[in-house]
């Protein structure tokens, strides 16, 4: 059975199970007169898939060989780091300060490990990406603890946001998958009404280069509360209706960086571990294709972070320069894969 889709409005929840012999299946969720398309195990090629993603569609795929291996590798690291404790129950066993210490060592180890990059390379090939033109940033290992334990700093629980508020290009595609089984109450939520509706926000105060220089390195210092300045909605965001996709371990969900989404408050009693990474396609970078800019005003660019799928080299300098905005003098080269927001 393919992933469950939950569309919530007020106190009413409807769940749709989409299968049909694991073939491509399109489910349209209606909000007013608007549609959000969900593709399950789609046979679209990468060009067609990116076009749909830039229109706000979401793609979900069953677990693939490389994706399962990446999740297995992540579990090996997680379980070794937290041994002898159950990683999904560490909130019941460890002081939060000790947990933060472990994560501060664990997460970079996963992010920068050569095996992580190699398995991402395999995932991209399995999903029909042209490795000579598809660039990715290194995968992040995310944690979402029960909200009364740790939800700041290195385990930040994200408020409703678009990744484009954080200087991501509009051609960026986000890939997300769970490492252990998840439930609707410890994943992430999309807020589909805002795909075309602007949200007054403070993204104009965010510069990616400044973030890397001043705020990125000290995430583990923010244990009780996170005081780092991040772009936020400056008006109340209607949380409902919202969409949650409950994927299988190694099942990948793809969506545009322009989607408004948030971390679901973890009320299921177990810690969620997930992996995410981002891709851009060279043709779209050159042509400045992508999702529409509804309300993003951040400066700087994350274009320096992406690695080519075929050989792990960076984007060409002249392609990156297309995204300069006058703040590039503040750019300080850093290890590829500086952490950026996601669940």
Please provide the spans of the model-predicted regions:
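Non-heme Fe(II)/2-oxoglutarate
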Residues: 259-343
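A short secondary-structure junction signal
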Residues: 151-156, 171-172, 185-193, 199-204, ...
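N-terminal auxiliary "cap/dimerization" subdomain that precedes the catalytic jelly-roll/cupin core
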Residues: 1, 5-128, 320-343
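Elongated scaffolding segments in large macromolecular assemblies
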Residues: 52-54, 62-82, 246-254, 258-260, ...
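Conserved double-stranded beta-helix
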Residues: 122-189
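Double-stranded beta-helix
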Residues: 185-256
């Amino acid at each position: 059975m393919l992933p469950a889709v939950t569309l919530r409005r007020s106190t009413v929840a409807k769940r749709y199970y989409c299968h049909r012999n694991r073939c491509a299946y399109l489910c349209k969720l209606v909000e007013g007169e608007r549609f959000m398309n969900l593709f399950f195990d789609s046979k679209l090629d990468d060009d067609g898939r990116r076009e749909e993603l830039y229109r706000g569609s979401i793609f979900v795929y069953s677990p693939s060989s490389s994706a399962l291996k990446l999740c297995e590798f992540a579990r090996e690291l997680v379980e070794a780091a937290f041994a002898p404790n159950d990683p999904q129950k560490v909130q019941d066993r460890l002081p939060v300060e000790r947990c933060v210490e472990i994560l501060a060592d664990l997460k970079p180890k996963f992010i920068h490990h050569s095996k992580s990059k190699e398995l991402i390379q395999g995932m991209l090939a399995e999903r029909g990406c042209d490795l000579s033109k598809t660039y990715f940033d290194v995968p992040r290992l995310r944690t979402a603890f029960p909200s009364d334990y740790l939800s700041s700093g290195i385990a930040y629980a994200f408020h409703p946001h678009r990744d484009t508020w954080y200087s991501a290009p509009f051609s960026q595609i986000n890939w997300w998958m769970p490492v252990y089984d998840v439930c609707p109450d410890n994943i992430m939520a999309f807020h589909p009404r805002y795909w075309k509706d602007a949200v007054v926000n403070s993204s104009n105060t965010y510069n990616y280069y400044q973030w890397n220089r001043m705020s990125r390195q000290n995430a583990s210092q923010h244990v009780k509360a996170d005081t780092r300045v991040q772009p936020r909605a400056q008006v109340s965001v209607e949380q409902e209706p919202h969409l949650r996709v409950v994927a299988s371990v190694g099942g990948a969900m793809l969506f545009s960086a322009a989607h408004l989404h948030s971390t679901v408050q973890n009320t299921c009693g177990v810690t969620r571990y997930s992996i995410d990474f981002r891709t851009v396609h060279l043709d779209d970078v050159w042509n400045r294709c992508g999702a529409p800019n509804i309300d993003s005003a951040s400066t700087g660019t994350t274009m320096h972070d992406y690695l080519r799928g075929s050989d792990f080299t960076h984007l060409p300098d002249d392609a990156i320069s297309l995204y300069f905005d006058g703040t590039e003098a503040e750019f300080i080269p850093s290890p590829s894969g500086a952490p950026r927001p996601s669940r």
